[in-house]
Amino acid sequence: MSSFDIVSELTIHEVRNAVENANRVLSTRYDFRGVDATIELNEKNELIRVTTESDFQLEQLIEILIGCCIKRGIQHTSLDIPSESEHHGKLYTKEIKLKQGIKSDMAKQLVKLIKGSKIKVQAQIQGDSIRITGKSRDDLQSTIQLVKNAELGQPLQFNNFRD
């Protein structure tokens, strides 16, 4: 029986590098001179705090951060960006959560998608990952294509492929 795992993982050091690059870009931008603007990574809580003086500048900071994340190989769908910003005094703040691990409702949706496709594989939810087992390698590859083509709103990786 061949098998592989579907996971959703972020390499935290790549996220740290993206935040540092975004701060470097921020320090060179002319429109942010003299503005109290920061991008901070909290690795313990897995979130990025973006703070600046206006809502418009906040959106620009988020675009800078997304661009730096894409350059580092982090998909923008792994960032859970809230639609509303918090306003404290003269500063606007957004706390961007990092999506890591497959939540139970997403896992159930994936298993339902795979079973509904009539591909001869079994899907098992194992904590933050999903184990897919099947008799032929072709079935597993068609399952990978099915999951890649599905719009799930979260980046997924395939690892631990065993023949």
Curated annotation (Swiss-Prot):
Pfam families: DUF520. Signal peptide: none annotated. The keyword Transferase does not apply. Disulfide bonds: none annotated. GO terms for cellular component: cytosol. Keywords: Nucleotide-binding. One of its GO terms (molecular function) is nucleotide binding. CDD domains: YajQ_like. It comes from the Bacteria. NCBIfam families: PRK05412.1. Nucleotide-binding protein. HAMAP family: YajQ (MF_00632). Belongs to the YajQ family. This is Nucleotide-binding protein HAPS_2236. It comes from Glaesserella parasuis serovar 5 (strain SH0165) (Haemophilus parasuis).
